[in-house]
A protein has these predicted regions:
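Domain-level signal for soluble alpha/beta catalytic cores
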Residues: 1-5, 19, 27-32, 68-132, ...
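Short secondary-structure transition/capping segments
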Residues: 57-66, 90-113, 232-240, 271-274
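Glycine-rich, N-terminal phosphate-binding loop and its surrounding beta-alpha-beta segment
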Residues: 42-83
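Short C-terminal domain-edge/linker segments immediately following a structured domain
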Residues: 42-48, 86-92, 220-225
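Active-site loop segments of alpha/beta catalytic cores
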Residues: 1-36, 42, 53, 120-280
């Protein structure tokens, strides 16, 4: 009823909890990234004790996978050399992974930009992907595949396989504890995730300050990038049409639509318009 904007019999409670369940139940957020069985038990105890109406645990993140990838946009408890304490959630490190002159490349060839520029910058251990490219002339043999079997690319593929194995372990544990909680009467609050397209550019590509500056210096490119991010997300949500999910709700945090940093016209054009496109 509450989701449908009808008056419910009682107020539903399903707060976003972060590291709280682990810390209250004798575990830690570090365990949520490295010791899934311990973290799962903490989650079950927490939900049984406090009885919220739904779970907001969206899945375990693999600390080992992020170590292998040398992830640069977060720091996390358990990473060798980290200063993040075990009880803390991961910490975001905002960087510019795309400079202002690269909007045309992003818009013209999103996949190519991700392979050759974004992924090597955000995950340096797989920078062997940076040389992957295809030349369309004289496709009579395997020559166009050369960049895929270069030594650097093969090293990146081998490491990606190891990263995938670690992420698969996290996904398996996440699904197991989610099913267990559902059987106990705590269904998931969300079965998908997304962001306002402007926030995607600000969070993961240009950084907050650069994105706000781009409103003035590269408004057309920023608007086009936001529209593209809306389309990419809409395509990614098509599974909602077919998958037998217990609920069909998307976790959708809003980060950067701040009236102190954009005019009403800018908000309408580059924040609200692509966000509304995602919603409708």
């Amino acid at each position: 009823d509450a989701t449908a904007l009808r008056e419910p019999e009682r107020i539903p409670m399903c707060p976003m909890l972060g590291a709280l369940p682990y810390n209250l139940e004798g575990s830690s957020y570090r365990a949520a990234m490295y010791n899934y069985s311990e973290a799962s038990e903490a989650l079950v105890k927490f939900y049984q004790e406090f009885q919220p109406d739904a779970t907001t645990h969206t899945g375990f993140t693999s600390g080992k996978a992020n170590e292998l990838a040398q992830s640069t946009m977060i720091d996390w408890p358990g990473r060798p050399g980290t200063s993040v304490p075990d009880f803390s959630t991961h910490q975001v490190i905002e960087n510019e992974y795309m400079d202002e002159n690269e909007y045309p490349e992003l818009l013209k060839d999103f996949t190519g930009f991700m392979l050759r520029k974004y992924i090597p910058r955000a995950f340096p251990s797989v920078n062997g992907l940076a040389d992957i490219r295809f030349v369309p002339s004289i496709v009579l043999n395997t020559t166009p595949l050369a960049s895929l079997y270069s030594r650097q690319a093969q090293e990146a593929f081998s490491l990606l396989a190891k990263i995938g194995e670690e992420d698969a372990k996290a996904a398996e544990a996440s699904n197991a504890v989610s099913n267990r909680l559902a059987d106990l009467g705590f269904p998931p609050m969300f079965t998908g995730a997304g962001e306002a397209p402007f926030d995607i550019i600000g969070d993961y590509y240009r950084g907050t300050l650069a994105t706000l500056t781009d409103q003035l210096e590269y408004p057309e490119e920023l608007e086009a990038a936001c529209d593209m991010m809306a389309d990419i997300q809409i395509e990614s949500w098509q599974y909602f049409k077919y998958a037998p999910l217990p609920v069909k709700r998307v976790f959708f945090p809003l980060h950067k639509g701040m009236d102190g940093f954009m005019s009403a016209e800018q908000y309408e054009k580059i924040y609200w318009k692509p966000l509304k496109k995602c919603m409708l």
